[in-house]
Amino acid sequence: MKISECMTQDVRLVSPDDTIERAAQMMGSADTGVLPVSDGERLVGMITDRDIAIRGVAEGCGPSARVGDIMSREVKYCFDDAEADEVLVNMAEIQVRRMPVVDHDKRLVGIISLADLDREEPARSGHALREITQPSGTHNQSR
């Protein structure tokens, strides 16, 4: 199955010049934890609720801070004609739950999530989720 057959096509976008307050409000109304950041038709980053909390609020940025100042610039993406099982393996390897989908002109056409893939390939998405939720570093909240 191709990613274009199971991706979410109605994707909300923010601009690098939008405020993190606006991004957080959009996440809340869309019930999502991630928004692609675009400059016109070009995908230039991603911003997550974690980015807002860790790179924004925890670093003293106020609600008027710009998305472009705290977004992740290194965007991992897949093509709309990629096979779903290959994308799922890639998502597990790079430990992401959501990935922007672009066409071969690198224009954003959708977003794929583990939930989207779970509807199509539940057994494989469970394995990917286990890989994604493995800690990538030392974490200790037992103190």
Model regions: which residues?
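A contiguous binding-surface segment within folded domains or other stable secondary-structure elements
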Residues: 41-42, 46-86
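Bateman (tandem CBS) regulatory domains
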Residues: 1-11, 65-75, 132
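A glycine-centered beta-loop-beta connector
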Residues: 6, 27-30, 35-51, 91, ...
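The conserved cystathionine-beta-synthase
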Residues: 13-31, 38, 78-95, 102-103, ...
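Cytosolic regulatory modules rich in charged/polar residues
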Residues: 83, 104-143
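Nucleotide phosphate-binding site architecture
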Residues: 4, 12, 21, 53-54, ...
